[in-house]
From Swiss-Prot:
InterPro entries: DHPP/DHXA_dioxygenase, Xdiol_dOase_suB. It comes from Pseudomonas putida (Arthrobacter siderocapsulatus). This is 2,3-dihydroxyphenylpropionate/2,3-dihydroxicinnamic acid 1,2-dioxygenase 2. It catalyses: 3-(2,3-dihydroxyphenyl)propanoate + O2 = (2Z,4E)-2-hydroxy-6-oxonona-2,4-dienedioate + H(+); (2E)-3-(2,3-dihydroxyphenyl)prop-2-enoate + O2 = (2Z,4E,7E)-2-hydroxy-6-oxonona-2,4,7-trienedioate + H(+). HAMAP family: MhpB (MF_01653). Gene3D superfamilies: LigB-like (3.40.830.10). The keyword Iron applies. GO terms for biological process: 3-phenylpropionate catabolic process.
């Protein structure tokens, strides 16, 4: 087995507004078991596909995909802050390979990432710098968005590159499943917030970041009382999506439009594209077997919360 995968939902609300203790314990056991499997695999390289939430990427320049040559986690919502351990030579070679394959991958030598990257590194690996990691941003919240097909091809291109490294490679996908938290939309905000989305939102002062956290907490409290205050979770679609990735039927999603996905499951459900990229990268290493599937809708976290592992069959 030269390639392993784990995909996991993230939520900024952990520790800020939590479900009952039995649910917390259940999720904690899922994460603990996944972390133990990853430790047993002992990856030599990690490729992490994750979104951003207007913390590192803004409308001044909004690429569909970006690979970090260097990356720093900002520590939003109490997540880990600090420097990711990016092997620059491997990242540069990966970018060249992916571009040569026909995927227009941007690069950043000053990438900033938020909880979407930090949580899986913390929960599944034990820290930001425990393993060499290639951080791959996938734009999942700022229209215009990449399609499922392009994300699948991105993952395949990265997987074909890592296949040639002769290393044990771990692919991580972060985000989803169905959810629509109160993320600002450029077409619907006032001039001040539009300016934030266009770039002035970098390095927010602590009081403004705290206010953002509190807005999300209040939205979650209201959502628990009435799921019509935001787009409702869609467990049926979430389970369908888990079936797709579990059975390596990724191309079935190619014709699902961005607008239809938003209508079905919420505008932030596009974060599942990070999972599609990760599974596509794994598939480039050979046929895979998925294991340890978990799903629970958790209104307190405004998320259909999912987790799944997979490994190549050779």
């Amino acid at each position: 087995m030269n390639a392993y995968l784990h995909c996991l939902s993230h939520t900024p609300l952990i520790g800020h507004f939590d479900p009952n203790q039995d649910v917390l314990d259940e999720v904690a056991e899922v994460v603990r078991a996944a972390r133990a499997r990853i430790e047993a695999f002992n990856p030599e390289l990690v490729v992490l596909f994750a979104p951003d939430h207007y913390n590192g990427f803004f409308y001044d320049v909004m690429p569909p995909f970006c690979l970090g040559m260097e990356a720093e986690a900002i520590g939003d919502f109490g997540s880990l802050a600090g420097t990711l351990s990016v092997p620059k030579d491997v990242a540069e070679a990966c970018a060249e390979s992916v571009l040569t394959s026909g995927i227009d991958l941007a690069v950043s030598y000053r990438m900033q990432v938020d909880h979407g990257f930090a949580q899986p590194l913390d929960f599944l690996l034990g820290g930001l710098d425990k393993y060499p990691v290639l951080p791959v941003f996938v734009n999942c919240v700022a229209p215009p968005l990449p399609t499922f097909e392009r994300v699948r091809l991105l993952g395949d291109a990265i997987g074909r590159f890592t296949r040639g490294l002769n290393k044990r490679v771990l692919f991580l996908g972060s985000g989803g499943l169905s959810h629509q938290p109160p993320v600002p939309e450029l077409a619907k905000v006032d001039a001040r917030m539009a300016d934030r989305l266009m770039g002035s939102g970098r390095n927010l002062p602590p009081e403004e970041r705290d206010a953002r956290t509190q807005r999300v907490v209040v939205a979650a409290e209201r959502f628990v009382e009435n799921q019509n205050t935001l787009h409702p979770l869609n467990p049926k679609w979430d389970r369908y999506f888990l079936d797709v990735v579990e059975q390596d039927l990724l191309s079935q999603l190619d014709d699902l439009s961005n607008a239809h996905l938003s209508e079905l499951a919420g505008k932030s459900t596009h974060e599942v594209k990070a999972w599609v990229a990760a599974f596509s990268a794994l598939s480039a290493h050979g046929a895979y077997t998925a294991t340890d599937r978990y799903y629970r809708p958790i209104p307190e976290w405004i998320a259909g919360f999912g987790s799944i592992s997979a490994h190549t069959q050779r």
